[in-house]
């Protein structure tokens, strides 16, 4: 078994899909450009949630190539409507910007990774169901026992699997980012827990580092 982490570049979707088909557990994270589009959207919505059309259009246009093979782009349309509804709700209840950002980016990672899994014809798993942190204010406070138990229990019979990467849950169920290298960390955790033959960690400049599993 090989465990890989991928940066989801929209212009490389076909290549990523092809690599997810062969005895591979793939961890997907978003490209920085898409993260930046969400930061703009969230900051603009805080100022005036009625004036975010341009930001919504930018995100939709960016994601459209990933969903063009789905009937009527339904998953993307549903996700865009979800974003609008969530922002209205979160802003009304004064949810902290950091929590809004983590939650929406985790949801986007989930939607994109699920699309990749469907295009590849393999199973999908929400990475937030695997990695557990003790404290939302300390991303290094991993609950290793719970995390490794989750991975071994939920992935043990999966030879082909796509996982949304970079986000975790606290013991209280709160969603949080585990940092820019979160998908690589998750790939390493999965690889070690599953005794993978090889772990491949992809970085933004497209260099690939192959790390033997422990």
Task: Show which residues each predicted segment covers.
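Nucleotide/pyrophosphate-binding catalytic subdomain
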Residues: 1-214
């Amino acid at each position: 078994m090989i465990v890989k982490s991928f940066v989801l570049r929209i212009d490389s979707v076909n290549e990523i899909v092809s690599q997810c088909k062969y005895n591979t557990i793939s961890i997907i994270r978003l490209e920085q450009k898409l993260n930046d589009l969400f930061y703009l959207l969230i900051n603009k919505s805080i100022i005036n949630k009625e004036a975010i059309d341009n930001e919504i259009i930018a995100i939709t246009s960016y994601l459209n190539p990933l969903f063009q093979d789905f009937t009527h782009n339904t998953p993307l349309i549903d996700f865009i409507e979800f974003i609008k509804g969530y922002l209205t709700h979160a802003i009304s209840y004064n949810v902290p910007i950091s929590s809004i950002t983590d939650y929406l980016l985790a949801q986007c990672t989930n939607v994109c990774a699920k699309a990749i899994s469907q295009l590849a014809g393999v199973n999908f798993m929400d990475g937030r169901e695997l990695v557990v942190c003790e404290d939302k204010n300390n991303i290094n406070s991993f609950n290793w026992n719970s995390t490794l138990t989750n991975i071994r229990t939920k992935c043990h019979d999966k030879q082909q699997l796509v996982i949304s990467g970079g986000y975790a849950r606290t013991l209280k169920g709160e969603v949080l980012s585990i940092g820019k290298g979160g998908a690589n960390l998750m790939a390493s955790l999965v690889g070690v827990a599953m005794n993978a033959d090889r772990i491949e960690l992809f970085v933004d400049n497209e260099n690939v580092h192959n790390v033997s599993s422990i």
